């Protein structure tokens, strides 16, 4: 039986190391429109160029989800298919994958497909994809993998730290006043993905040092107890180094994986931003 683990580019992995036997990982890209340019969020994307252009334009940039046809093409050739999408509150990717599933199963009734709305982005999506690969490698049946990943998802969370909010302001999700204050006062926005998949603000911290402490405090408050952490970041090695030290002071054996953000996650996290998935 051939497996496919499929994720849209709300996941930061472009490829997966140590793939389970008879398993393929496929990234289905969203597109991001900046001014007149449309960027496809795949392995060839020059994220630095996209971000530079995004900050140079005064108009709102926007993303577009994969089409059902994009998903159907990614399903081809597998018996067992599991899809993970960015939260449905930010994108139509989940709905697109569900439509593709319905059509594909009519044409391939012996295939098995499960679509997961991560209710999240970045690091937490990465955690789910990583766990799926481990579950398949254990030799579990399709239904067992679905049950296990559903249970696992209930024990993962997303914490985000934003140093810039230009996109949120341009898209009308934050007022210009707040955007100006964040820039002038060196404010970091610390928040989480809620249980319904919305991004909620938890704290405003002034400066990197206070943001690191705020992020760690929120992790502990949410029930973190030394489990795996995946941090997707947009050019903020210093934060990761100091935050990792703080985590390992309390949890010496904590496993921390660090990834650069995908194009889509760079679009949301912006320069210096982080999207951190962790187990509770």
Where do the protein language model's features map onto the residues?
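Flexible, charged surface loops at secondary-structure boundaries
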Residues: 1, 75-78, 222-225
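Alpha-helix initiation and N-capping motif
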Residues: 47-48, 68, 129, 142
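Generic beta-sheet signal
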Residues: 3, 81-83, 227-229
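Short beta-strand segments
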Residues: 6-7, 85-87, 116-117
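Mixed-charge interfacial surface used for oligomerization/domain docking
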Residues: 10-20, 24-26, 30-31, 37, ...
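Glycine/charged-rich beta-loop-alpha catalytic/anionic-binding loops adjacent to active sites
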Residues: 78-83, 106-116, 258
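N-terminal glycine-rich anion-binding loop in soluble enzyme alpha/beta folds
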Residues: 2-64, 70
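Active-site cofactor/cluster-binding pocket
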Residues: 66-101, 105
């Amino acid at each position: 039986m051939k497996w496919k683990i499929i994720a849209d580019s709300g996941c930061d992995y472009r490829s997966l190391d140590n793939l389970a036997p008879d398993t393929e990982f496929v990234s289905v890209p969203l597109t991001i429109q900046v001014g007149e340019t449309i960027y496809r969020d795949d392995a060839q994307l020059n994220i630095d160029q996209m971000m530079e252009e995004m900050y140079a334009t005064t108009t709102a940039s926007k993303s577009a989800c994969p089409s059902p046809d994009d998903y159907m093409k990614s399903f081809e050739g597998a018996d067992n298919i599991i899809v993970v999408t960015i939260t449905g509150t930010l994108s139509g990717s989940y709905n697109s994958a569900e439509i593709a599933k319905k059509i594909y199963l009519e044409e391939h009734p012996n295939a098995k497909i499960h679509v997961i709305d991560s209710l999240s982005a970045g690091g937490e999506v990465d955690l789910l994809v990583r766990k799926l690969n481990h579950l398949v490698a254990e030799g579990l049946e399709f239904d067992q993998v679905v049950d296990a990943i559903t249970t696992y998802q209930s024990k993962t969370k997303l914490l985000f730290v934003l140093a810039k909010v230009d996109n949120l302001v341009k898209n009308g999700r934050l007022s210009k006043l707040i955007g100006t204050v964040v820039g002038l006062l060196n404010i970091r926005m610390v928040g989480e993905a809620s249980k319904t998949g919305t991004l909620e603000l938890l704290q405003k911290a002034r400066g990197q040092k206070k943001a690191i402490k705020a992020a760690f405090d929120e992790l502990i408050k949410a029930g973190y107890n030394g489990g795996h952490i995946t941090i997707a970041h947009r050019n903020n090695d210093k934060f990761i180094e100091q935050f990792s030290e703080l985590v390992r002071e309390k949890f010496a054996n904590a496993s921390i994986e660090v990834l650069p953000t995908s194009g889509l996650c760079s679009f949301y996290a912006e320069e210096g931003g982080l999207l951190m998935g962790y187990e509770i």
